Amino acid sequence: MATRSQNVAAAPQPPQNRGNVAALGKQKAVVAGRPDAKNRRALGEIGNVMNVRLPEGKPLQQAPAGRTANFGAQLLKNAQANAAANKQNAVAPAAVARPAQRQARKAPVKPAPPPPEHVIEISSDSDQSMRQQSEGSASSVRKCSRKKVINTLTSVLTARSKVACGITDKPREVIEDIDKLDGDNELAVVDYIEDIYKFYKVAENECRPCDYIDTQVEINSKMRAILADWIIEVHHKFELMPETLYLSMYVIDRYLSMQQVQRRELQLVGVSAMLIACKYEEIWAPEVNDFILISDSAYTREQILAMEKGILNKLQWNLTVPTAYVFIMRYLKAGASADNKSDKEMEHMAFFFAELALMQYGLVASLPSKVAASAVYAARLTLKKSPLWTDTLKHHTGFTESQLLDSAKLLVTSHSTAPESKLRVVYKKYSSEQLGGVALRSPAVELCK
């Protein structure tokens, strides 16, 4: 075996390329001629199939058969080193020449494209919204050019329709700050006056008198008007606070809504109701004997006190209610802000209509805020104020002119018939010079037509 290996190793073999198929076939033929060729298979040299990248024109030298693996590995190492050196020599010039090629490519300047034509498209609102969304997403990519937004034909036609209908020409509501002059007045509670009147608006819907005349057997609306006329006269003679008058009428109507009263006790109800209101509102309230004298001793002390207790129990001692008086004061302030002055005549005229409203049974079930707004509206109409109903008044009252017309007509009618009426206490009271003689003004009969 050693002699055979030496002979094979000593025999010179021509150099063979990697892809030389003829030499490989010859080698296979020699191996096939051996006696044990059928029992075992010859192993090829690793160096013959090694994939080594060499420069062009230099063939790979194949290791002679029979050499050890160390010689093939050494040959492979040398070939890889030569390939790496040749590769560095070949890449360096290309890397140097590449910037020149890039600069040469940037030299030609392309002409600027012509500006795109603006086309107005007619599309639906949904298409327009989708287009706007797509444009919004693409705006981050196209930051370099921002074009002016072009209105579509649909938006143009919509705007023209609004102009034709007068929608865009409608001015915005101008709400005056009616409390700006009371900033230094601690009693005006400017910081939460709006919250107070919001509470009044909610509270006025509770514990309201209802339409009770049909439930009363011996009392009608005319008798109630007579009682109201007498209460107003007593209030004026005693020179009581205005809050006392409105609270007295509330107690009367509220009690009559819950309890049937005989005809002979109707005035007793009025006397006891005024006594309750005086104790609630006045600093120096009249005594029971004063009411006995003013009623011409029609009732005794015990009767007045017993009726007082009965009324309070029926009302469950609930006397803290907003009346028309608190709303009138607020609405007059809003009207004075609109007129840019404090009008005393306007104040007297508004309270004149408010006291006429106390005698009208048709306004018993109305909200105090609506009665107050109707009184202010009728007063402005009688005094020919312009504008008649401002945005500030609408904001603070919560009512429009159309909502106040029916109540205002009733008040203006009462004003026109007051001089010939038998119940003339209110008319005489406001005909005096002390209250400006506002009752003598010509009524606004044009509202009743």
Swiss-Prot record:
Compositional bias per record (Low complexity), positions renumbered to this chain: 90-102, 121-134
Keyword annotations: Cell cycle, Cell division, Cyclin
Family: Belongs to the cyclin family. Cyclin AB subfamily.
Pfam families documented for this protein: Cyclin_C, Cyclin_N
Gene Ontology CC terms, in alphabetical order: cyclin-dependent protein kinase holoenzyme complex; cytoplasm; nucleus
Record-level Gene Ontology MF annotations: cyclin-dependent protein serine/threonine kinase regulator activity
Database matches in InterPro entries: Cyclin, Cyclin-like_dom, Cyclin-like_sf, Cyclin_A/B-like, Cyclin_C-dom, Cyclin_N, Cyclins_cyclin-box
Top-level taxonomic group: Eukaryota
Gene3D superfamilies, sorted: Cyclin-like
Biological process annotations from GO: cell division; G1/S transition of mitotic cell cycle
Region Disordered: start-end pairs: 1-34, 90-143
Record's keyword annotation contains Cell division: yes
Cell cycle among keywords: yes
Protein name listed in UniProt: Cyclin-B1-1
